[in-house]
Structure formats: structure tokens, C-alpha cells
Amino acid sequence: MSAKKILIYYPLMEWYIQQGLIVTKVYGMIHCKKCKIFKSFGELVCNERRKGDIDAKYKVIGEEIKTIGNSSYGRTSMNKAKHNKTSYETQQEYKKSVGSPYFRDADKYGEVYEVQKRKHNTNQNMCIQLSSATLQYAKLRMLQFVYEFLYKFIDKKDFNIMYMDTDSIYSAFASDRIEDLIKTELKSLYEEEKSLWFPRTDTPENTTYDNRTAGLFKTEFTGDGMCALCPKL
């Protein structure tokens, strides 16, 4: 890894340093008080989705709360500087707009022009630290799964990472069951630590509960082949 002047959250940087990364220069630091300010919101999303899994009458609510949870990230990552002001103008008005430093683009529809302009003022009131933290914590979790689980418990000849997204990983395994690929000398440790990575399987209730627990890896799809871009790792 090599980078210059990047914004990186301390938990992710700490993990990188533990792996051997050397930080040669720090340009600035933003100090904040550590707290779980969105804990209740996260628990609400998970619990409502669990209710939808258990009782069909709550299924619609579970799907809606999923959308709310996902949009909380998407909304806070919005770059309002890219927003345009749209107006519909006559040819004479259009000619004036073309000379404006705020002009961006235009389309003609009959005798009317649809003109796109930059806004004179942009109110940057999005909580971008939330979306930034979401991305960096997601990256940290994916790296932990690869380096602290896959590379640790499974021989590299028995799997191949094919594709990775923000919160998902697609891999080819030499067996239908991960348990069959665990290194012999680490099977006991795997049994102790597997609940840190996957939903519990001791009871149906625990499995259903853990399937909606953030940070655990669940099977979304299985198949015999896949065409994919290189993994984002």
C-alpha cells in the first residue's frame, strides 16, 4: 500500500500499522470524543428486520427499515456541490445564460431551452463524517475477514477471492462447506472464533437473530461460476 495525503480513520490506520504499514508524515488530525451516537438507530434497523423474519406481518416494515438504513449512508455521502439549478428559458434568455460563469449545460426542446447552472450558494449541511466512517469501518471489517479469518484458517490453495464490494465478498472455495477447508491444527480455534465472523448455528432462533447482526458474514448466493472484476482489496 502506498498513498499520500489521505483521510483515514484511526481504527483503520491502527490495523494497517499492526500489519506493518509505516506512516512517514501526518499533515493534520481531527480529534473527536469517541461515542456510539447512532447505536440506537442501528439497533432499530436490525431489530425491525428481525421482526420481519419472524412474523410475515412485519415483513414489509422490515424491508422499509432496510431502505431507511441504507439511505442514511447514501444521504450523508451526498455531494451538494454537484447540484444544479434547472430553468426553462427562451432563446434570448438562453443566449445570456451561456455567458454566465455558472452555466453548465443546456438542451433544446422546441422553442424552449432547459438550462443547467451551478448554484450561486451551496449549503453543505450533510453529515459527511457518517458516510466517511461507514466506508472506512466497512473496509476495516473486510480486511479483518480476509487477513484474520480466510488467510488464517484456510490454505490459500483452497480458495480464491473473485470480487469484493463495500460490504460483500465473492470467493471460490474448494469445497461446498468452509468447515471442510479449515486447517486441521486450527479446527478447535475455529470453533471458538467462528461466531465472531458468522451467524450462530446452535439454534434456529440464534441463526435468525444473527442473520440481521451487523458485521457478521452471511451467505447471499452460491453458484458454480462467476465472471468478475478484480477484487477491491
Residue ranges and their predicted role:
Residues 1-233:
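Conserved acidic
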